[in-house]
Design a protein with these regions (language model features):
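Soluble metallo-hydrolase cores and metallopeptidase-like ectodomains found primarily
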Residues: 25-27, 103-104, 113-114, 118-145, ...
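Sec-dependent N-terminal signal peptides
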Residues: 4-14
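N-terminal capping segment at the start of a domain
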Residues: 23-59, 96, 204-207, 212, ...
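Acidic/histidine-rich catalytic neighborhood of metal-dependent amide-processing enzymes
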Residues: 179, 259-262, 285-376, 459
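Noncatalytic luminal/extracellular "stalk/propeptide" segments of secretory-pathway proteins
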Residues: 24, 30, 46, 50-164
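Second-shell loop/turn segments in exported
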Residues: 28-36, 50-60, 97, 118, ...
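A conserved hydrophobic secondary-structure block that centers on an alpha-helix together
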Residues: 136-199
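Active-site-adjacent substrate-binding region
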Residues: 185, 195-196, 213-216, 232, ...
């Protein structure tokens, strides 16, 4: 009799598990179907990119994006939509930059350049000086002040093409952009030219943030990025004649901080409203292009998560919140302000997901989690396998959600295919035309599915 009862109980348990799995599978199927057939992310991104455009912190376009984001979230009939005050830096590019390689009296070759974010301007008449090519900071230090003083330093360390993970390649080269001016200035250089962070050879210079550290204003020097084709040309010419001169003209300027906002919307949890699940991207972008991949795609995908859940009449157990962060590109003020305010309110964030790697085909997610948490996450992998989401790895999640890191909150980042991302990253060709509608929608569906699973199972 006991064996019979045990057998029946076991069969009921297995049946219940199968039923639950089937139910979750069906829900994820609905999410993907809605995203691919009735999605709104692509149309949202069309407006954000083409009607608003580049959205550098402190600019009019950034404020237009805040107004647009709040209005669109209010249209979703969420439980709450509000703005969070953030003070952000204001840097203005001014007129477009000009540069040339001077090969002799009356002879020069123009090359594509752009100011690096945060750089100072050149004198109004421009800056002309001898140029020296180096690959790393060790080479710079070995030259010493006597060989660097009054010269342009040309940082020409290319992203390693042999690395499959292009973000790893980026991490091995980006310090020349972020720290190059400070280090060269300390040795008396008059300016720096940095090879663009781009694996492809083309004529688009790629901007990005740089910093002077604690350098006094009088020691600061102009910094610009040169396109990869321009870098190849300059390097080739220097190999033939190491007595070349370079000319740079730019009139960018830093201003005092100005007020801006994060945009936040949420659906209140029905069972555990104090457990918060956050999804987001950054609303600001660089000013050369439209910021379609970086990070317009992440913004509309994050908004789409809440829209899809509402569309399928899903009632979340936990509070699901979308945050459109301001100022990731040149200050991270939005992310740090959000985390600071959340801590002061003693909010319990159990999970945070960020999309800031472009709108390409999603491959999976990376997680910052404990062993126990990650084992639970891996048990969900079978739900997303049919949609070719097979990368579940431990690793860095995202800049904006990083300030929420506390040892308990699980942090995650969407990881699309990255091979084309740096073709567009921080460049003038990061436009809506570079977006594939289906890839964008697949990313939104993958994110929504993961948020659904976290809400269902928790930690």
């Amino acid at each position: 009799m006991k064996r019979t009862i045990f057998a029946v109980s076991f069969l009921l348990f297995v049946s219940l598990l199968h039923s639950q799995k089937t139910d979750h599978t069906k829900q994820i199927e609905i999410i993907y179907n809605l995203s691919l057939t009735k999605g709104k992310a692509y149309n949202w991104l069309d407006h954000l990119s083409n009607q608003i455009g580049g959205r550098l912190s402190g600019s009019l376009n950034a404020e237009r994006a805040v107004f647009w984001g709040k209005q669109e979230l209010e249209n979703l009939d969420l439980d709450r939509v509000y703005l969070e005050d953030v003070m952000v830096p204001k840097w203005v590019r001014g007129t477009f930059e000009y540069a040339s390689i001077i090969t002799g009296p009356g002879r020069s070759t123009n090359v594509p350049v752009c100011s690096l974010g945060g750089s100072i301007s050149t004198p109004a008449s421009g800056l002309r000086a001898q140029v020296i090519e180096i690959r790393n900071f060790e080479e710079l230090e070995s030259l010493g002040e006597e060989n660097v003083k009054d010269k342009f330093i040309f940082y020409n360390r290319a992203m390693p093409a042999g690395l499959i993970n292009t973000f790893e390649a980026y991490s091995k080269t980006v310090n020349q952009r972020s720290q190059g001016a400070e280090k060269a200035a300390r040795l008396g250089a008059v300016g720096v030219i940095v090879r663009s962070m781009n694996l492809r050879l083309d004529d688009y210079p790629h901007t990005g943030n740089m910093r002077y550290g604690n350098l006094p204003n009088k020691m600061r020097i102009p910094a610009a990025a040169i396109s990869t084709n321009g870098a190849q040309l300059l390097s080739s010419m220097l190999s033939l004649n190491n007595d070349l001169y370079f000319y740079l003209k730019q009139d960018c300027k830093n201003f005092p901080d100005v007020p801006s906002n994060n945009v936040i919307g949420e659906i209140k949890g029905s069972e555990f409203p104090n457990e918060i699940i956050v999804v987001g991207g950054h609303l600001d972008s660089w000013d050369l292009g439209d910021g379609a991949h970086d990070d317009g795609a992440g913004i509309v995908q994050s908004m789409e998560v809440l829209r899809l859940l509402k569309k399928m009449n899903y009632k979340p157990k936990r509070t699901i919140r979308v945050v459109l962060y301001m100022n990731e590109e040149n200050g991270l003020r939005g992310g740090t302000t959000y985390a600071k305010n959340a801590k002061s309110r003693k909010e319990n964030h159990i999970f945070a997901l960020e999309s800031d790697a472009g709108g390409f085909t999603p491959r999976g997610f990376v997680f910052e989690a404990t062993k126990k948490q990650f084992n639970k996450i891996k048990s969900w992998k079978s739900y997303l396998g049919p949609y070719m989401i097979d990368r579940f790895e431990l690793g860095g999640s995202g800049a904006d959600i990083g300030p929420l890191r506390n040892g308990n909150t699980v942090l995650s980042g969407l990881r699309p295919d990255s091979q084309r991302y740096f073709d567009y990253h921080h460049a003038a060709n990061d436009t809506f035309e570079a977006i594939n509608k289906r890839e964008l929608e697949l990313g939104a569906a993958a994110m929504t599915s993961l948020i659904y699973l976290v809400d269902q199972f928790g930690f």
